[in-house]
A protein has these predicted regions:
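N-terminal segments that mediate ammonia production and transfer
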Residues: 1-187
Length: 187
């Protein structure tokens, strides 16, 4: 279930705390601002999460080559926001693999094409698996299955170039690595 709206989501007034949704909601993923690149005003199609048939993505950062990716792989995508290329590129490689590639390999293939900065949460909506990755941007996770760009007590910084997967809705495990093209050097 995806709920996307301008302003605050109130779990009570939006009836999300109603027990009838418990069977459908395994976790909540949120993004609290409109995109900062091409579209500053909140619109449904240009706000997080961005979706394709099999993927849902929230992203913090700035992709510098999204127009080139769009032209080469997904020229039908006309969304002006850089983030929109990520789920569509994941979908492109998912369809190319025809169920022969594990999701973490599709993610690796996608991330190695991206230039710029990103902190990503990706959901494979075909099986509800959740993945994290980052390049340049900050992303923290903890041993309870949570993640945040803000961090806090008990949170660890996700290393660049690592893909984590949420196992059993309670812990993050490393499932792959990718070659980064980070514009920043952290020592």
């Amino acid at each position: 279930m995806i709920l996307k709206q301008k302003g605050t989501i109130d779990f009570d007034s939006d009836n999300l705390s109603d027990k009838k949704f418990d069977q459908y909601i395994e976790y909540y993923i949120g993004h609290v601002q409109a995109p900062t690149s091409a579209q500053r005003e909140w619109l449904y199609d240009t706000s997080h999460p961005f979706e394709s048939l099999s993927w849902s993505v929230v992203h913090n950062g700035v992709l510098t080559n999204y127009e080139n990716i769009r032209a080469q792989y997904i020229d039908w995508d006309v969304n002006p926001v850089d983030t929109a290329v990520i789920p569509n590129l994941l979908q492109h490689f998912t369809e190319q693999c025809r169920d022969e590639c594990p999701a973490h390999e599709i993610i690796k293939q996608t991330l190695e094409l991206l230039e710029g900065t990103f902190a990503l949460c990706m959901v494979d909506t075909d099986c509800n698996d959740v993945y994290l990755a980052r390049q340049g941007s900050i992303l923290h996770y903890n041993d309870k299955g949570d993640f945040s760009t803000l961090g806090g007590e008990g949170f660890k910084l996700l290393p660049e170039g690592v893909i984590l997967m949420l196992k059993d809705n309670k812990e993050w495990v490393e499932v792959n690595k990718f070659n980064t093209k980070s514009p920043f050097l952290f020592l």
